[in-house]
Amino acid sequence: MLVTAGSLLGAIWTVLHLRILLLAAVTFLFLADFLKHRRPKNYPPGPWRLPLVGCLFHLDPKQPHLSLQQFVKKYGNVLSLDFANIPSVVVTGMPLIKEIFTQMEHNFLNRPVTLLRKHLFNKNGLIFSSGQTWKEQRRFALMTLRNFGLGKKSLEQRIQEEAYHLVEAIKDEGGLPFDPHFNINKAVSNIICSVTFGERFEYHDSQFQEMLRLLDEAMCLESSMMCQLYNIFPRILQYLPGSHQTLFSNWRKLKLFISDIIKNHRRDWDPDEPRDFIDAFLKEMAKYPDKTTTSFNEENLICSTLDLFFAGTETTSTTLRWALLCMALYPEVQEKMQAEIDRVIGQGRQPNLADRDSMPYTNAVIHEVQRIGNIIPFNVPREVAVDTYLAGFNLPKGTMILTNLTALHRDPKEWATPDTFNPEHFLENGQFKKRESFLPFSMGKRACLGEQLARSELFIFITSLIQKFTFKPPVNEKLSLQFRMSVTISPVSHRLCAIPRL
């Protein structure tokens, strides 16, 4: 009897002991997290957070940019919303966004680097670098892009050539249902390839197709649960399988692809006759034998080239996919565009950039596609470089800043029908009207450096396609504006019919 009672007490003590240990561990976790993430006085308000995961659980992972808006209504235009263990603040409204990106921009020039991105790029390249590295790389990239045609007739002719190839590829579909995704990707990517690599690829080139597949998959994987968890538990997840490992593998293969192109360039490189971005970068590297004093090194060459390749492909390609989808969904808009194209350009020649000023409706449609597509809903994040005071709130150094472009592009005070595709938003008395509350390329010193190129591509590609085809939904297939959330917001997979215009 005593033995039985003793065993029972021992079992009870074991259970209680485990519970006490668990409670102590949880208490310690909360206390450690509280001490680590203590906020200064006058820190922006926001929803409550949990240790490690922050406020992520408050947002719908399928549409975080939309579910965020409830907190804007509750807490105001400056609210705290921590992403995992990164202290973050969301800023809403054009006056505050302008203040951040113009008047106080020196305080917000840096980029935050998550553990995932640090593993991938280690603060190299153009997009996620900061400080001296960013200044050197951006200045060089802008100068080099201009030298190789940005804003010049030569690059416009390359876009026209690629638009011709895209039209021919779509014509080969014979009016049957097809997924436009990869043909558009190939066309857009070839423009930046001609600048960075000095050549375009044939659409059937297997290496080119694999490179685009790896990039597209990487964009989807980066927003996956395992990749987000890597930002919280990197030391554990580095040994576990999952989508994060596939992401790492994809970027390794992409870096290897760029490395091979660089090796080929070195074989016949002439510093006096640079052919493209890579040649120009190699020439810049040669000026600095001591690589410790400059960001012009092999790793930055690879990362900057990949940044140009990604930024020059993903964003414009995604916008073009939204454009064709909108044409199929809104045939009356497509008919008006075609009427304007026929009147200004006709069928006998290709569109060129000089046509844009004579085509206000087409220009308005392109801008409305960008507004409704809203492909980068939080903008590319910034980081507070020094302790900063904004709108009555204290923002400590290191805080991540997200600008709420979704609210800006769907503000009922700015847009007559904010949730509806309506090109009239960009028209006034039949003429194109610029809108201040429209920032698809951001603003300030860290605005998209390829904005001019992207605008040129969007006009020539979209106009060329609508000139030659009428896009329709396949029979018995319903299209919608449903989206897929990844690094960008893209349409869900769909098919279209491109009917040649006679």
UniProtKB/Swiss-Prot annotation:
GO cellular component terms given for this protein: cytoplasm; endoplasmic reticulum membrane; intracellular membrane-bounded organelle
Domain of life: Eukaryota
Annotated membrane topology: Peripheral membrane protein
Compartments, record wording: Endoplasmic reticulum membrane; Microsome membrane
Catalyzed reactions: an organic molecule + reduced [NADPH--hemoprotein reductase] + O2 = an alcohol + oxidized [NADPH--hemoprotein reductase] + H2O + H(+)
Entry keyword set: Endoplasmic reticulum, Heme, Iron, Membrane, Metal-binding, Microsome, Monooxygenase, Oxidoreductase
Swiss-Prot/TrEMBL cofactor(s): heme
Listed GO biological process terms: epoxygenase P450 pathway; linoleic acid metabolic process; organic acid metabolic process; xenobiotic metabolic process
Primary localisation category: endoplasmic reticulum
Tissue specificity as recorded in UniProt: Abundantly expressed in heart and liver.
Matching Gene3D superfamilies: Cytochrome P450
Known role: This enzyme metabolizes arachidonic acid predominantly via a NADPH-dependent olefin epoxidation mainly to 14,15-, 11,12-, and 8,9-epoxyeicosatrienoic acids (EET). It also acts as an omega-1-hydroxylase by metabolizing arachidonic acid to 19-hydroxyeicosatetraenoic acid (19-OH-AA).
Family: Belongs to the cytochrome P450 family.
Name of protein: Cytochrome P450 2J3
